[in-house]
């Protein structure tokens, strides 16, 4: 879940927020998402970042910025607010480019969220203002602002710009840390410098890179570092004193509430324009500012080598896989935004916290475009596994709460890496454990399953300890005996995957052992976890079922029904009944709920989940991750139309959802029908482990261009609505133009024939990998 300092959520209409459903529009071939209002139905979020710097923006260009130090410290540079005021020096009238916080009526407004950049355009009172923010494709911890004003009228205008950027540069838990802070203007660097250096000289404390700055490409007319001097007494950001007076006071700030405010005056003849560039960033010391300003404060909106390099880098993120289907919304997600969202997950995960299962699953999706970066993170995950096989819950910072599922996620992620690259030598890499000793990657994977095999309860199911995938099942295993059905199913899937890996590298005895483990666990699940119409969620310390018809609330859970298929556990008749139960009890109309009915009162043997507000988070929300698992289960079973219906229901742009959410990125979930006041509103854009699963479901199972340990195979599962589709895929250095014909418009039709460059090809064989380029024609059965 989000921490308390992330982007501001829009206020629901019943509490005074906007009730207008402002539509979104794709531009620039799907690479920009545009909205023509600063007040959408639900706040839009865009993440722009590089490995060391993250800026989180809403549709007004507001949002915080963070710096990841070389030591892994996640330090906040900018607070939530970032405003640019535009003032007419003659009339005293002013507006804010991002609409907030002045909220003055505009003539035209547009926000365009791009890949690692964002542009806001605002035409108010005859002034066209353009404000672009981007983070360069480098490791420099900076963001660049380009601001241009154009006089659209027939009279000369004397205009003023005022920036407003609160910059506490906090992030370390120091006793009275603010007492060491100073913010002042450095004329040589043309920068406001927020300095937190003093603690590094204290005994045992060293905090390099904990300083921030706001720099400009010219000498400002004035500046302020004191928030109090900018706002003034008994005022707010809606009517700041410095802006109303049209003059900064050149104030320093000692200790409390530093702000980056600079004043720029522009004289604009009719039709004329002027442009200024700012840069915000983190630095180790003042001299570093000068090197960064020399590097970055020379470009403009029209000509900027760093912005050009950014566009080139973003294009490379999706070059190995492009799809074309009759569904343009799906195409935009798969071709542009899902690769970007996966990349964000690999680099920043959850705002800098490296959740173990989160980053591993992101790597599972990243191997197509960034196999080396994915492997680097997977090896880090190995290094955060204990010798016993238990994996940490996360790092940055270290979280060792005993969530039992962490390390088993490595099995499927490494499988995807091996299938994509064919780099089986990686299994022999030696990686240290987090506590003691070291082992090969293969042994790390084996230990993850051995840990689960040993941690079993009275029903031979896996012990849940503090929680499994569902973080909030904290009451199931208070006394150390509670068992998780989902984790037992995940163990089954991991056993089968590792068996395939072991067999591929000649470890046939291991493969047989893993398959035996799967069979034993599947038998235990079918014996103890079937409730008559669905699989239960868990058994508590005393063997009482959770997620059962006999429970008052939380009778049925989603994940156990999907993972019964993914772990190859469910018999045919039980699958049919289980799926019917899902449709009967969990369908919201715009995605499947995680459980039902929602908990409305605390249940001791369930724990935190039962105290979460109904419809939120894990308590009966439409959780995207859970829907992704079911989507894969449906595709594995060949249920193409049902899968496509589920995709359309849960995808973020579904117009049937009560709240119109941004359509370009997946949310963690949506408040469910039982929510008191936010039904259908997206929870936490960008930060979800569902993206690689959704991406893989569409590209490898629906379109069927699937990597395996033996190579690339074609096994589509197209919905009946699609007569054709195509995939451009680069795999192990070979390029394939794959064209799929479903002339009979048959759901889930099997492959009838394949030709490669016009010659017939065996439909059961992997495609040839020879470093060349090939046209692959796939005809499905009519």
Locations of regions flagged by a protein language model:
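Aromatic-rich carbohydrate-recognition surfaces in CAZymes
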Residues: 85-87, 366-462, 484-492, 621-643, ...
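Anionic coordination/interaction segments
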Residues: 1-357, 372-380, 384, 416-421, ...
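Secondary-structure capping and boundary motifs in well-ordered enzyme cores
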Residues: 123, 139-141, 270, 329, ...
């Amino acid at each position: 879940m989000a921490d308390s300092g992330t982007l501001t959520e829009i206020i629901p209409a019943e509490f005074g927020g906007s009730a207008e459903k402002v539509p979104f529009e794709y531009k620039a071939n799907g690479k920009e998402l545009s909205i023509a209002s600063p007040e959408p139905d639900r706040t839009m979020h865009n993440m722009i970042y590089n490995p060391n710097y993250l800026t989180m923006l809403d549709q007004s260009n507001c949002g915080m910025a963070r710096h990841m130090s070389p030591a892994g410290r996640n330090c906040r540079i900018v607070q939530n607010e970032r405003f640019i005021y535009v003032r007419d020096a003659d009339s005293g009238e002013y507006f804010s480019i991002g609409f907030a916080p002045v909220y003055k009526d505009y003539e035209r407004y547009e926000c365009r969220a791009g890949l690692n950049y964002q542009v806001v355009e605002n035409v108010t009172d005859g002034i066209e203002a353009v404000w672009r923010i981007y983070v360069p494709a480098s490791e420099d911890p900076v963001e660049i602002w380009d601001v241009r004003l154009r006089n659209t009228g027939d009279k000369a205008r004397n205009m003023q710009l005022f920036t407003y950027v609160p910059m506490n540069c906090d992030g370390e838990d120091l006793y009275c840390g603010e007492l060491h802070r100073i913010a002042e203007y450095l004329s040589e660097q043309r920068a406001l410098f927020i300095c937190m250096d003093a603690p590094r000289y204290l005994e045992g404390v060293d905090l390099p890179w904990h300083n921030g700055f706001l720099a400009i490409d010219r000498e400002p007319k004035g500046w302020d570092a004191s928030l109090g001097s900018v706002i003034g007494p008994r005022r707010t950001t809606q009517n700041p004193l410095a802006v109303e007076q049209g003059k900064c006071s050149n104030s320093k700030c000692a200790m409390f509430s530093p702000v980056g405010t600079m004043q720029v005056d522009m004289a604009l003849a009719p039709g004329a324009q002027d442009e200024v560039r700012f840069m915000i960033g983190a630095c180790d010391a003042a001299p570093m500012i000068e090197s960064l300003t020399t590097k970055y404060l020379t470009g403009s909106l029209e000509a900027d080598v760093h912005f050009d390099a950014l566009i080139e880098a973003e294009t490379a993120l999706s070059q190995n896989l492009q799809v074309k289907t009759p569904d343009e919304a799906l195409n935009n997600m798969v071709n542009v935004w899902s690769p970007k969202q996966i990349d964000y997950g690999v680099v920043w995960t959850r705002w800098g916290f490296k959740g173990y299962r989160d980053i591993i699953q992101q790597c599972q999706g990243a191997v197509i475009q960034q196999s080396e970066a994915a492997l680097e993170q997977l090896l880090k995950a190995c290094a955060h596994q204990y010798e016993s096989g238990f994996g940490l819950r996360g790092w940055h910072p270290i979280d060792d709460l005993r969530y039992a599922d962490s390390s088993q996620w490595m099995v499927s992620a490494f499988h995807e890496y091996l299938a994509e690259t064919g780099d089986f030598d990686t299994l022999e890499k030696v990686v240290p454990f987090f506590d003691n000793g070291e082992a090969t990657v293969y042994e790390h994977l084996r230990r993850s399953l051995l840990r689960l095999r040993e941690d079993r309860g009275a029903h031979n199911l896996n012990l849940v300890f503090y929680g499994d995938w569902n973080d909030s099942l904290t009451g199931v295993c208070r006394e150390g005996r509670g068992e998780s059905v989902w984790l037992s199913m995940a163990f089954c899937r991991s056993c089968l995957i590792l068996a395939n890996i072991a067999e591929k590298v000649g470890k046939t005895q291991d493969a047989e052992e893993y398959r035996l483990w799967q069979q034993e666990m599947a038998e235990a699940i079918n014996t103890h976890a079937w409730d008559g119409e669905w699989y239960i969620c868990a058994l508590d310390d005393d063997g009482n079922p959770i997620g059962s018809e006999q429970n008052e609330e939380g009778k049925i859970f989603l994940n156990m029904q999907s993972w019964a298929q993914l772990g190859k556990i469910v018999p045919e008749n039980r699958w049919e009944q289980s799926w019917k139960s899902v449709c009967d009890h969990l369908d919201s109309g715009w995605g499947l709920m995680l459980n039902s009915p929602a908990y409305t009162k605390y249940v001791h043997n369930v724990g935190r989940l039962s105290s979460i507000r109904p419809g939120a988070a894990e308590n009966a929300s439409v959780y995207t991750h859970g829907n992704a698992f079911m989507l894969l289960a449906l595709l594995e079973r060949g249920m193409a139309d049902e899968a496509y219906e589920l995709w359309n229901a849960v995808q973020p742009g579904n117009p049937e959802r009560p709240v119109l959410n941004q359509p370009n990125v997946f949310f963690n979930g949506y408040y469910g029908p039982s929510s008191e006041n936010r039904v259908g509103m997206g929870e936490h854009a960008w930060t979800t482990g569902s993206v690689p699963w959704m991406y893989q479901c569409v590209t490898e199972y629906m379109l069927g261009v699937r990597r395996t340990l033996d190579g690339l195979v074609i096994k589509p599962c197209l919905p009946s609505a699609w007569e054709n589709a195509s995939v451009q895929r680069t795999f192990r250095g070979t390029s394939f133009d794959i064209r799929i014909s479903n002339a009979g418009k048959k759901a889930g039709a099997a492959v009838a024939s394949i030709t490669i460059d016009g010659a017939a090809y065996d439909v059961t064989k992997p495609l040839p990998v020879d470093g060349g380029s090939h046209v692959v024609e796939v005809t499905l059965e009519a």
